[in-house]
UniProtKB/Swiss-Prot annotation:
Gene Ontology cellular component terms for the protein in this record: nucleus
Protein's organism: Arabidopsis thaliana
Function according to Swiss-Prot or TrEMBL: Transcription factor. Essential protein involved in iron uptake responses. Regulates FRO2 at the level of mRNA accumulation and IRT1 at the level of protein accumulation. Confers enhanced iron mobilization responses at low iron supply.
Region (Disordered): 90-138
Biased composition (Acidic residues): 100-111
One Gene Ontology biological process: regulation of iron ion transport
PANTHER family: TRANSCRIPTION FACTOR FER-LIKE IRON DEFICIENCY-INDUCED TRANSCRIPTION FACTOR, TRANSCRIPTION FACTOR SCREAM2-RELATED
GO MF annotation list: DNA binding; DNA-binding transcription factor activity; protein dimerization activity
Protein name: Transcription factor FER-LIKE IRON DEFICIENCY-INDUCED TRANSCRIPTION FACTOR
Pfam families cross-referenced by the UniProt entry: HLH (PF00010)
Residue spans of biased composition, Basic and acidic residues class: 121-136
Upregulation: In roots by iron deficiency. Repressed by cytokinins. Induced by cold, UV, ethylene (ACC), jasmonic acid (JA), flagellin, and salicylic acid (SA) treatments.
Residue stretches making up the bHLH domain: 127-176
Tissue: Expressed in roots and inflorescence, and to a lower extent, in leaves and stems. In roots, confined to the outer cell layers, specifically in the differentiation zone. Also detected in the endodermis and inner tissues of the central cylinder.
Length: 318
């Protein structure tokens, strides 16, 4: 231990060993140059230290073994106490700190890889957003095309915005539905009137079918013996009809009168002046008639209504 202290004291004095004084200096030079002739099998082990054995630098046998750190700093007599404490604090914590720094560097590498993963996720999110925007643009384009087609079908468009186009289309559809309902009701009324008219007209063919069985010239079931039409006002007329009696004659007379819907019937009277005839008189007001009205035209209207009910005229009317 004393030899170690002497060695450290020599180190602290910063004194250099003068190898020029040593007798083995020439031998060192020869070894470096390679001029030695006889070399033993292990020249290092056979090397004669000589005076170097007593040198202060090679006192301890374990001089090449590293001295423990605690013993080294415990044997520092000339150092300041603060400096010695600082050396003593150098222990495994510093090593662990260094290891932790290395671990942090490694973790930084992991964080960078995680960042790369996050970047990939961000790229995927951006790609999804771009696809969503493209699909939304296509959907809006299709909607615009459909709105333009709808606008071309609707006749009355108030404004060119989307809400106005849809609202006008709804109103137009509702109007078409109301017109369809009205037309259906009109068609139903016409069918009912045609069915009723056709029922009465079927009697004439039946009568014609039965005529061969009655005889060659059977008497007609409905005959107009006389018809007089007189104009009493500008659009007022008086009508007088004489016909034979028979089954269903009186109802047919009134049905022919009801068929004159373009005129207003002011009064009517049905009487029987003789056992074989009926007398029907009535007055018509043609103020509601839109077309030009005169006496010949009125006679044609009345004649047509009677013919539709199956009447026959025996002689020309006046």
């Amino acid at each position: 231990m004393e030899g170690r202290v002497n060695a450290l004291s020599n180190i602290n004095d910063l004194e250099l060993h003068n190898f020029l004084v040593d007798p083995n200096f020439d031998q060192f030079i020869n070894l470096i140059r390679g001029d030695h002739q006889t070399i033993d099998e292990n020249p290092v082990l056979d090397f004669d230290l000589g005076p170097l054995q007593n040198s202060p630098c090679f006192i301890d046998e374990n001089q090449f073994i590293p001295t423990p750190v605690d013993d080294l700093f415990d044997e520092l007599p000339d150092l300041d106490s603060n400096v010695a404490e600082s050396f003593r604090s150098f222990d495994g914590d510093s090593v662990r700190a260094g290891g932790e720094e290395d671990e942090e560097d490694y973790n930084d590498g992991d964080d960078s890889s995680a960042t790369t993963t996050n970047n990939d996720g961000t790229r995927k999110t951006k790609t999804d957003r771009s696809r969503t925007l493209i699909s939304e643009r296509r959907r809006r384009g299709r909607m615009k095309d459909k709105l333009y087609a709808l606008r071309s079908l609707v006749p009355n468009i108030t404004k060119m915005d989307k809400a106005s186009i849809v609202g006008d289309a709804v109103l137009y559809v509702q109007e078409l539905q109301s017109q369809a309902k009205k037309l259906k009701s009109d068609i139903a009324g016409l069918e009912a009137s045609l069915n009723s008219t056709g029922g009465y007209q079927e009697h004439a063919p039946d009568a014609q079918k039965t005529q061969p069985f009655r005889g060659i010239n059977p008497p007609a079931s409905k005959k107009i013996i006389q018809m007089d039409v007189i104009q009493v006002e500008e659009k007022g007329f008086y009508v007088r009809l004489v016909c034979n009696k028979g089954e269903g004659v009186a109802p047919s007379l009134y049905k022919s009168l009801e068929s004159l819907t373009s005129f207003q019937v002011q009064n009517s009277n049905l009487s029987s002046p003789s056992p074989d005839t009926y007398l029907l008189t009535y007055t018509l007001d043609g103020t509601c008639f839109e077309q030009s009205l005169n006496l010949p035209n009125l006679k044609l209207w009345i004649t047509g209504s009677l013919l539709n009910q199956g009447f026959e005229f025996i002689k020309s009317f006046t």
